A protein has these predicted regions:
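A positional/architectural concept
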Residues: 10-30, 35-42
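N-terminal beta-strand motif that seeds the catalytic metal site of vicinal oxygen chelate
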Residues: 1-7
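Flanking helices and flexible, charged tails adjoining ferredoxin-like Fe-S electron-transfer domains
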Residues: 2, 31-67, 72, 83-156
């Protein structure tokens, strides 16, 4: 069963626990600038929305990487950056339409959400349940795929 992050912006309080948990899980420090998930605030509405890599089926970042440093983790479905292969060219950051791949100057490599190899720290840390790690079927992923197939067939 494939799982995915489900984000409910209505439950987000902008506490940044997700960012802190992510940076600690990946770097051993509480530093939101090192987080692979970000909480964006829409200033005109005051709404806060956590966002991170959506682990696209057709991952442009993976296809754009000239050294094939982004690979599919078949256990989690996550697209994972292989740090020992990444050359820091940033082509994947340009290819990602959502802006969820970030260049880390300290290490000269890119980073993106890897779902913490199946146990996302952000979901564990979220006190309000705004971020949950659930069966992908519950996120509507299958319905979106069915709709896409239907529209592709209609266009053909």
């Amino acid at each position: 069963m494939q799982k995915s992050l489900h984000i409910d912006p209505n439950k987000c309080t902008h506490c940044l626990q997700c960012e802190m948990a992510c940076s600690f899980e990946n770097y051993g420090v509480f530093n939101n600038s090192k987080s692979r998930i970000k909480v964006f605030e829409f200033h005109h509405t005051g709404r806060k929305v956590p966002y991170t890599c959506t682990q696209c089926d057709e991952a442009w970042c993976m296809h754009a990487c000239p050294v094939e440093a982004i690979k599919l983790d078949k256990n989690t479905g996550a697209k994972v950056v292989l740090e020992d292969v990444c050359v820091g060219c940033k082509v994947c950051t340009v290819a990602c339409p959502f802006g969820t791949i970030n260049y880390v100057a300290d290490i000269g490599k890119v980073q993106k959400c890897d779902l913490c190899f199946g146990e996302p720290a952000c979901a564990e840390a979220c006190p309000t349940g705004a971020i949950t790690f659930i069966d992908a079927n519950w996120t509507g992923l299958d319905r979106m795929r069915q709709w896409a197939e239907k529209t592709d067939t209609a266009a053909a």
